[in-house]
Amino acid sequence: MNETQLTHLQQLEAESIYILREVVAEFENPVMLYSIGKDSSVMLHLARKAFYPAKLPFPLLHVDTGWKFREMYEFRDKTAKEYGFDLKVYRNPQGAQLGINPFIHGSAKHTDIMKTEGLKQALDKYGFDAAFGGARRDEEKSRAKERIYSFRDRSHRWDPKNQRPELWQNYNGQINKGESIRVFPLSNWTELDIWQYIYLENIDIVPLYFAKHRPVIERDGTLIMVDDDRIDLKAGEVITQQKVRFRTLGCWPLTGAIPSQADTLPAIIEEMLISTSSERQGRLIDSDQSASMELKKRQGYF
């Protein structure tokens, strides 16, 4: 079967598998960043296909903040156990000792210390020279201009004005000692592509993506699910039960839910076809500062 006979999703799958294999062939110590979300689940599925029947030739890394949804932790541990993945979990020890959290310290400081600095510490600790991430270009404007091979200096910083050309699926992976790259095999996928692929490949995902009655509060126009007793209720806030789901997942105090009746994959796909808003509108960390995502990426965020 030649390329012209492949379906749209098959072409995307083939491109992603090519990128995964190319990185493993080029780099000495790659790792896959596993955030437990739908994109991570698709990327992990593609990696299993790329190297089947062998085990994955790299570990998974989850940079934990201590504030993920409980269902995410359960799904992470179940997945690692079921497939026998080498899962490394890292949490910024200084941030944990100081009790950094989104309620007291705010989303910007929480993200910088527990996510960005935590990721940089983990990459340095294990000496990884390439890190797969599940980011897509359609998610956010700073990601739209980022290459598939995203080069980082010795401090893990990204310079959007210093990117290498990527012509005809040729990727230049030459780096100096101490430098690294972030690799995005799903760059050319859209949110709809992800959901259609999950449906066609029957990929297991966190149940939070499906609509269900959940305890939520409304804060600054965003529905926040109350996942545990660490919630810091403000005056006038009342916990109510609403049927909601999540289009994107992160730390639960910083992730907005959407009202939805979509409790099956076909219903989610139908919802995506008529949606006019970005999936990351519910990620409060994307709007906590001016040019927030690009600033975070320049500092070392994935």
Curated annotation (Swiss-Prot):
Q: What reaction gets catalysed by this protein? A: sulfate + ATP + H(+) = adenosine 5'-phosphosulfate + diphosphate
The answer to whether keyword Transmembrane applies is: no
Q: Which CDD domains match?
A: Sulfate_adenylyltransferase_2
Signal sequence extent: none
Pathway this chain belongs to? Sulfur metabolism; hydrogen sulfide biosynthesis; sulfite from sulfate: step 1/3
Per UniProt, the keywords (alphabetical) are: ATP-binding, Nucleotide-binding, Nucleotidyltransferase, Transferase
Q: Name one GO biological process term.
A: hydrogen sulfide biosynthetic process
Task: Return the broad EC class.
Answer: transferase
Q: Which domain of life is it from?
A: Bacteria
* Keyword Nucleotidyltransferase included in the entry's annotation: yes
EC no. given is 2.7.7.4
Q: Which GO terms describe its molecular function?
A: ATP binding; sulfate adenylyltransferase (ATP) activity
The family line of this record is: Belongs to the PAPS reductase family. CysD subfamily.
- Assembly state and interactors? Heterodimer composed of CysD, the smaller subunit, and CysN.
Function in brief: With CysN forms the ATP sulfurylase (ATPS) that catalyzes the adenylation of sulfate producing adenosine 5'-phosphosulfate (APS) and diphosphate, the first enzymatic step in sulfur assimilation pathway. APS synthesis involves the formation of a high-energy phosphoric-sulfuric acid anhydride bond driven by GTP hydrolysis by CysN coupled to ATP hydrolysis by CysD.
What name is this protein filed under?
A: Sulfate adenylyltransferase subunit 2
Q: Which gene encodes it?
A: cysD
